[in-house]
Amino acid sequence: MDENSTLSPAHSDAAASSSANTPPLPYVPSALAPFAGLWRGEGEGAYPTIDDFAYTEEIEFAPTGKPFLAYRSRTREAGSGRPLHSESGFLRLVGEDEAELLVAQPTGFTEIHRGQVREGTIELSMVVLSASPDAKPVHSIRRQLSVRGGDLTYDLWMAHDLTPLTHHLHGHLRRD
């Protein structure tokens, strides 16, 4: 293990009790380790062009054995359980304390964000937003992720068509 890596918190107990015949569990860069694991919780959404809404969410940042985590998010409408949004990608370390989030959405978008990792928080600024010809006219996205104890919170801002960058989503999840 190098000085920038550690076991994911979700895997540290299992690694301590593994036998010599069990392959080692994937390592996670220490700056990303607080994010590793499965998270479940709730969120709220608002935007000037739509009605406010509430949702449940499951997010996973899964160790891969490389200096990045596989990312997956699935949301459902609160109450009915109807599927809403999903996205997947990778959270990777690109410097000692700089992370990059790569996201693909089935709505026709791919995003690349970069930001500093500081005390369990990543402020992510958009580097690239690509859209398929049929995707909605989203012009900019900004994200913030924070881990405090067993809680993951995030916020997302979006600029869409003629609406400037506006707070759109807030989620609060607990480590599963």
UniProtKB/Swiss-Prot annotation:
The keyword Heme applies. InterPro entries: Calycin (IPR012674), Nb(III)_bact/plant (IPR022939), Nitrobindin (IPR045165), THAP4-like_heme-bd (IPR014878). GO terms for molecular function: heme binding; metal ion binding; peroxynitrite isomerase activity. Its cofactor is heme b. Heme b binds at H168. Pathway: Nitrogen metabolism. A motif (GXWXGXG) lies at residues 37-43. It catalyses: peroxynitrite = nitrate. Residues 1-23 are annotated as: Disordered. It holds the Pfam family THAP4_heme-bd. Residues 8-20 have a biased composition (Low complexity). The keyword Heme applies. It is an enzyme of class 5 (isomerase). Binds 1 heme b group per subunit, that coordinates a highly solvent-exposed Fe(III) atom. Forms a 10-stranded antiparallel beta-barrel structure able to accommodate a hydrophobic ligand in its interior. In fact, this fold hosts the heme group, which is located in a wide surface cleft. Heme-binding protein able to scavenge peroxynitrite and to protect free L-tyrosine against peroxynitrite-mediated nitration, by acting as a peroxynitrite isomerase that converts peroxynitrite to nitrate. Therefore, this protein likely plays a role in peroxynitrite sensing and in the detoxification of reactive nitrogen and oxygen species (RNS and ROS, respectively). Is able to bind nitric oxide (NO) in vitro, but may act as a sensor of peroxynitrite levels in vivo. Homodimer. HAMAP family: nitrobindin. PANTHER family: PEROXYNITRITE ISOMERASE THAP4, THAP4 PROTEIN. Belongs to the nitrobindin family. This is Peroxynitrite isomerase 1. It comes from Rhodococcus jostii (strain RHA1).
